[in-house]
């Protein structure tokens, strides 16, 4: 418990007090936000605002995890390192994307295929390590089963060592790509992705701590125990990321003095996916990350409807004034802060529903 609290406190203090230094540095090197001309007019004032703030978020979380574990004289588990690897790895993909945007002053950084490739490399490496890094008893951080609140009977590795491994890797890649892109899409208004990510990842601090107290590895006689490796360390990492986000939000709230950029959104989405995979709650991501599902769904609906109507009538039509959904409400005249707070409320309800499902499953299992 001390490690959970300490990690969150260290990360919060780091981003709260160090982010101004990053703002100054990014202004000096010219890492400012590029704003599309066809976007909402209110966004034009954001041009030049320092971006790549995800560096501060990720660095704060990593330092906090290592600092908390070192202070308490505890080793860092493979599971914790895997989540940090995912966050740093996808953060690096986002950094390259951000760097190209700021250096060339355009809205397109990495091409779509290049970003998919980068996400794929990190996801595949994570999947292989999560399956192969076994302890003395043969337990690995991840399993080959699809999970909801715990592992189901759908074991992908049952298809054989080769086909099964390929299926697991593809499944993990899908989760990582969907989650990281979902957070990335939500990062369109000051503080929206920061606050929403803090709530969603915070759910895994609660889940990890609960799994630790009900762990089969601590006492196999516990009713409805969880076969999750290093669940307490997963809670520590989640707490560190949440602390880092809260400190960053002080500077990212409207009017934002710094943006997280793709460095932050892809890294945070990766951390969220990794926590879900290692806590064996993969499909619980749908309610916990419900806000990200909604905004991503709005983009998919917009594109599909436009292409269908263009194919049928020759003229593409749109469901929303603009996608993602938060921009639709901007164009309808809502204030940005109103949209952000209301979306936070939706995100909070989604997180509460997900955590509620997790607890109810344990209660009635």
What are these regions (language model features)?
Residues 36-50, 105-118:
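Juxtamembrane helix-capping/reentrant segments at transmembrane boundaries
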Residues 1-27, 57-95, 126-147, 165-365:
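Alpha-helical transmembrane segments
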Residues 23-40:
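Membrane-interface loops
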Residues 83, 104-115, 140, 161-164:
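Short, amphipathic alpha-helical segments
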Residues 93, 108, 114-118, 122-129:
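Short loop/hinge segments at the start of secondary-structure elements
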Residues 101-111, 148-157, 310-312:
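Membrane interface segments of multi-pass transport proteins and intramembrane proteases
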